[in-house]
Structures are given as C-alpha cells and as structure tokens.
A protein has these predicted regions:
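Bacterial Sec-dependent N-terminal signal peptides
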Residues: 1-22
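Acidic/hydrophobic-patterned starts of short beta strands in beta-sheet-rich repeat architectures
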Residues: 196-210, 252-255
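Short N-terminal segments immediately surrounding and downstream of signal-peptide cleavage
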Residues: 18-37
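Beta-propeller blade repeat segments, especially FG-GAP/WD-type strand-to-loop junctions
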Residues: 168-170, 216-235, 269-274
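Beta-propeller fold detector
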Residues: 177-179, 234-240, 279-286
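N-terminal glycine/threonine-rich, aromatic-flanked beta-hairpin/loop signature
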Residues: 31-70
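Acidic, small-residue rich beta-repeat scaffolds with periodic aromatic anchors
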Residues: 24-26, 45-50, 54-56, 72-159, ...
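Beta-propeller blade termini
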Residues: 188-197, 242-252
Length: 312
C-alpha cells in the first residue's frame, strides 16, 4: 500500500528542482560531571534543528531525542523521553538545553529539567574540524528530472531522478560537480547529508537515493569522501555496497543493520584503517533462540581475521 500511495503522490506533483542539505555534527562533553555524546542535525536555510544525546554510562541505546532552534549562534533544544506508565510508554518533555556556539565550535550553556528546579552547566566540544573545512560556506544543487524506472511490480513508472550534484563556494563559483550516477528519488527533493563518515574530522557527502523496485530496504546513499590533498570529494563505491549505514563519531566505527522482520537480526560493525574499512564485530540474534551470537575480528594484513566467537 505504501508504494501505491507514493506512486499516486508522484502523479500529483508539479516538477521543481529542490535540494535539501543537512549537516550532522557530533559533540562530546559533560552535563555537570556526567559525560555525554550529543548529535545535532542542522538544515541549511532553516533555523530548526533536531538530534539526540546519551549519557556515556548508559550507552547509545538509551538515547534521548532533541529538537529545537538554532538562531544567532544560540541553540535551544527540548528533550523528549519515554516514560513508563500504566498506558504504556508515553513521550514527555523532560528537560532542555540552552547553549551558545563559540568561535572554536564549543557549545557552552546549561541543561535544566522540565520543572526548572534543577540546572547544570554544559560544556561540549565538536568532534568535526569545522575550522579547517566548514561546509556551511558552500551550496549544493542537484540536476533533477523526470525519468522512467521499473518499480516492484516490474512496471516502468515515472520518478524524479538525479544525475548530477553541483557544489558552489561562497563566491557562487562552481568548484566541483559530482556525476556518474543516475538514481531515483522518493519525492521531488534531492537530499544531501554532510557527515564525517571516515572520521578524519572533515565533513563528507551522502546523497540519498531510492530503489523503486524494492519492497524492503528501499533507501540508501551514495558516499563521497573529502580528499584533503586533492581538495575534492571522491566517490567510495565499495562503501555503497553496504548501502544504508550508521556512523558513530565517538567510537570511530560504522554499522549496517539487517533484520527480516521475524526476529532474525544481524549487525555488522566496521572500522577504517589506511583508507579502507574492515569488519570488526558481528552481532546476530535469532527468532528461535534467547541467546545472541557475537563474533569479533582483528585487522591483520589488510584483512578481517576472526579471533573470538561466543554466545550470551
């Protein structure tokens, strides 16, 4: 039904070239004496922001949602937590941040609870090196057109397509064109995400793409890593074979999640080494077992070598 609805929407849209740009920034620091990791997503041309944070001792699985406003180098964020009640888990506002973005890309300010009777100092340092290369000084424009692509019913249907991304500097000069691809979009907006995906401190480019011929896992990214020496973005097709990935700036690893919807899950964790990436850990859960299988690897001679496997 979802796919049919999407096709119906496409028929109603008027063609317009639109490019959405979101920058993903990661911060490490403390609320009072308690270490936290915070992620903020900033949309170019908008003052709304969203993200999450977690206390290091609790782990990323206990992340707390954030949304708010970025204006005049000040960020105000409201946190939402799920509270257990007799009616189940209910989302409630449990606190807020009021932060100032410093010239060295620190965030300083306060956190206070919803009742405003508790208040703590907050200090956070950006993990990305924005002083060296700040992509907010650049603009991005897709070439978007209509084309026919085979859908999951094996029929050709009209979709918005992208085949080029032009990058301009603050002087409106075109500095690079990313091309050599031809992919469908899920709507009429081309989406760029700027995130450090190889953990060298510099923001890279992720281009969202859509697979109309799939029922599951119908979205992914094209990945372009910024080459500091060449001062340009270089496509990483090997990374694209893993499709939709999640990047952990604190631990400098990324993960691919797989699930079949029946209780079988497979998480694969990777690390970078010498401009390549390697499998370092696998976690498998099975629908017919209460135990989880863990497999650990070490990088030896440019290969992932299994060193340990256990259940718990």
């Amino acid at each position: 039904m979802k796919k049919i609805f999407v096709l119906f929407i496409f028929c109603q849209l008027t063609f317009a070239q639109k490019t959405s740009v979101t920058t993903v920034l990661h911060f490490s620091g403390k609320i009072d004496k308690y270490p936290i990791e915070l992620t903020v997503n900033v949309s170019q041309g908008k003052d709304s922001v969203y993200g999450s944070y977690y206390y290091t001792k609790n782990g990323k699985d206990m992340s707390i949602s954030l949304k708010g406003i970025l204006k005049n180098e000040e960020i105000k964020l409201i946190e939402t937590s799920y509270i257990s009640t007799k009616k189940g888990n209910v989302a409630k506002n449990t606190g807020s941040f009021s932060l100032k973005l410093k010239s060295n890309y620190e965030l300083n300010g306060i956190w206070q609870n919803e009742k405003k009777d508790k208040q703590f100092d907050v200090t956070l340092q950006c993990l990305e090196n924005l002083a060296e290369f700040n992509q907010k000084n650049y603009t991005y424009k897709f070439n978007i057109y209509k084309g026919k692509v085979e859908n999951f019913n094996n029929q050709l249907s009209d979709y918005y397509m992208i085949d080029r991304l032009d990058i301009y500097n603050s002087k409106k000069e075109k500095i690079q064109t990313l091309s050599g691809f031809k992919n469908a979009l899920s709507d009429n907006i081309g989406q760029v995400e700027l995130e450090d995906i190889n953990f060298d401190g510099l923001l890279d480019i992720k281009i969202y793409i859509y697979f109309p011929d799939r029922i599951r896992d119908d979205g992914s990214f094209l990945y372009y890593i910024y080459d500091k020496t060449k001062k340009e973005f270089v496509r990483n097709t090997k990374l694209e074979k893993l499709e939709y990935l999640f990047f952990d700036a604190k631990n400098k690893e990324f993960v691919r999640y797989e699930a079949d919807g029946s209780g079988n899950e497979h998480d694969m964790y990777y690390k970078w080494s010498n401009n390549n990436f390697y499998l370092i850990r696998e976690v498998k859960a099975f629908e017919d077992s209460s135990k989880t299988l863990y497999t650990e690897y070490q990088i030896k001679n440019n290969k992932s070598v299994k060193v340990k496997e256990y259940e718990k």
